[in-house]
Amino acid sequence: MVHQLKLLKDDFFASDQQAVAVADCYPQDVFAEHTHDFCELVIVWRGNGLHVLNDRPYRITRGDLFYIHADDKHSYASVNDLVLQNIIYCPERLKLNLDWQGAIPGFSVSAGQPHWRLGSMGMAQARQIIGQLEHESSQHVPFANEMAELLFGQLVMLLNRHRYTSDSLPPTSSETLLDKLITRLAASLKSPFALDKFCDEASCSERVLRQQFRQQTGMTINQYLRQVRVCHAQYLLQHSRLLISDISTECGFEDSNYFSVVFTRETGMTPSQWRHLNSQKD
């Protein structure tokens, strides 16, 4: 019998009074599936990788935000210069009188929407608070834990203000072109995406945007879109009874044979093999 790897508080928190800490991953290596006896917020700064959360794969890159409950199981694979930070916390140790339940999806149970995105503005402000939080949580001086918890509360509220669903920026958003491009790509799972049209609408240089995207994510635009679609296909193959031809259409592939070729190249298995193997987990 294979035992689930579990990360424990005693290995990450300085004392049983500490409620919050910061765990840097510069860069994040491949990490086997695991759970914790604490919760965490995960913010991705740059690079890319495959994050599998409760059997759902996400192709992650800059701006991705996850709320991870202690009971959630997750892993990292196929990482490429993936830089992220884990803000870890113990719900039962928090003393500040905030509506933690309302502010943090899945605060008390593994439920709610775990995956969100942050634009460049939110990321910049979050990075500043996390820097202060990291400093306070490593101090052995009076009121360090209280200061860290205050900063954690500020961070949680900031994330609430700036986060948005992966495929939908707020209509009044003033985020950067790169943020808008990643959102448009996430909204193009089922429909074709035309970069030239996007650049015409945004009055920007296609060449410059391609360079900026690759610099920040470590992928080309086409690679990212293809891998996001394959991740969605993996989820549908495991959790739905749709025909493979229908899944191909749902994931933006007009030809099911081409879908099978791409899927096999990205995962090392045909769609049928993937479905069979992963259906045994359910």
Curated annotation (Swiss-Prot):
Domain HTH araC/xylS-type: 179-277
GO process terms (BP): positive regulation of DNA-templated transcription; rhamnose metabolic process
Compartment list: Cytoplasm
Domain of life of the source: Bacteria
Ranges of the DNA-binding region feature: 196-217, 244-267
Location, primary (coarse class): cytoplasm
Disulfide links within the chain: none
Entry's Gene Ontology molecular function annotations: DNA-binding transcription factor activity; sequence-specific DNA binding
CDD domains: cupin_RhaR_RhaS-like_N
GO CC terms, sorted: cytoplasm
Key words, A-Z: Activator, Cytoplasm, DNA-binding, Repeat, Rhamnose metabolism, Transcription, Transcription regulation
Listed InterPro entries: AraC-bd (IPR003313), Homeodomain-like_sf (IPR009057), HTH-like (IPR037923), HTH_AraC (IPR018060), HTH_AraC-typ_CS (IPR018062), RhaR_RhaS-like_N (IPR047220), RmlC-like_jellyroll (IPR014710), Tscrpt_act_RhaR (IPR023699)
UniProt-annotated site: Interaction with sigma-70, residues: 246
Subunit structure: Binds DNA as a dimer.
Protein task: Activates expression of the rhaSR operon in response to L-rhamnose.
Protein's name in the database: HTH-type transcriptional activator RhaR
Organism: Shigella dysenteriae serotype 1 (strain Sd197)
